[in-house]
Amino acid sequence: MTDSAAPTAPTHERGAFGHPRGLMTLFNTELWERFSYYGMRAFLILYMTDVARGGLGLETQISGAIYGLYTFGVYALALPGGWIADRVIGQRQAVLIGGIVIALGHFTLAAPLVIPGSDYWSFYLGLMFLVIGTGLLKPNVSAIVGDLYEGDTPERRDAGFSIYYMGINIGAFLGPLVCSYFAEKVDWHLGFSLAGIGMVFGLIFYVRGIPALKGAGELNDEALANRDQGRKQLLYGLIGTAVFIGVMYALVASGTLAMTVVGFAQATGLIVVVVAALYFGGIMAFACRDKVERHRIFVIFLLFIGAAMFWSGFEQAGSSMNIFTRDLTDRVIFGWEVPTGWL
């Protein structure tokens, strides 16, 4: 008699160099998603601050605050995005839905091409779609890569992730070259459109390659058994979020709460710092059983600080460095002006 409940690793058909065929599906999906993300990011703040060529004409400080809130939202929503995938819809569906919402976000940003006068509402609505879509797609596509190598050797898994990250780098390199060029040289909204088209390409590769994923990215038995509970928790979370946003909007609109975009961005940054400090402090004070564990948590905390500083500097490439490059850098080579987003 055999135990039918014993977990078994999914059987994945091998492709190039002995890696699962599903790896190339995720390689192409993430390549085009990063193409769209970094392609749009390369000129986002330029569009916000531009006046002469149909941009939003916002002040640099306000534009920087919006950019900061956008990038914060993209990565912060990876937490609920991963939870929704694990408890309710599965990683495979989360990637598909996230990709569709990302494409919708880029095309919403491009709406002024066909809907004159829609610049402001389409801009904020488009960014909201991008934040939600990326929060669903980004953490879960990486998790599916790990599922493909369940039961495989660590060396092969590491090699698979190296190939996967190569796709990320290719997309991040090509996106600004294409999207930023047409945005700066032709029309800002054409750049948004090209970013959306890139995400559509990624969705096509993903949908066509889903059969190669086999069982990777699907809900496990425990999640399926508790799916109804997960749906209820998700519903409560959405209702709570909607109520919070509605109350905050009413307070700001009525003048009861004086809050600017810059002030909101600064408050968000302060909250993140406080939460991180309380989190690590709580672990060291109440969860660590001995000096060795506290030492290890402290090392993790130092690595956390280093990572935060690195990514804070890295994200300047899409904000302050773009403004510096546009205003204070000679970009003319042999009579041709290099697009700001390329640098």
Where are these regions (language model features)?
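Intracellular loop-helix junctions on the cytosolic face of multi-pass helical membrane proteins
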Residues: 1-19, 151-152, 180-322, 326-333, ...
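Helix-loop boundary and gating motifs at the non-cytosolic
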Residues: 17-71, 302-305, 311-324
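Hydrophobic core of transmembrane alpha-helices in multi-pass small-molecule transporters
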Residues: 31, 105, 118-137, 304-306
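A gly/Pro-rich, aromatic-decorated transmembrane alpha-helix motif that marks the paired
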Residues: 41-42, 80, 170-185
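Central cavity-lining transmembrane alpha-helices of secondary-active solute carriers
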Residues: 64-87, 138, 173-175
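Cytoplasmic membrane-interface "Motif A"-like loop-to-helix N-cap segments
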Residues: 87-102, 152, 157, 293
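C-terminal ends and interior cores of transmembrane alpha-helices
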Residues: 97-118, 123
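Intracellular juxtamembrane helix-capping segments at the cytosolic ends
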Residues: 136-151, 318
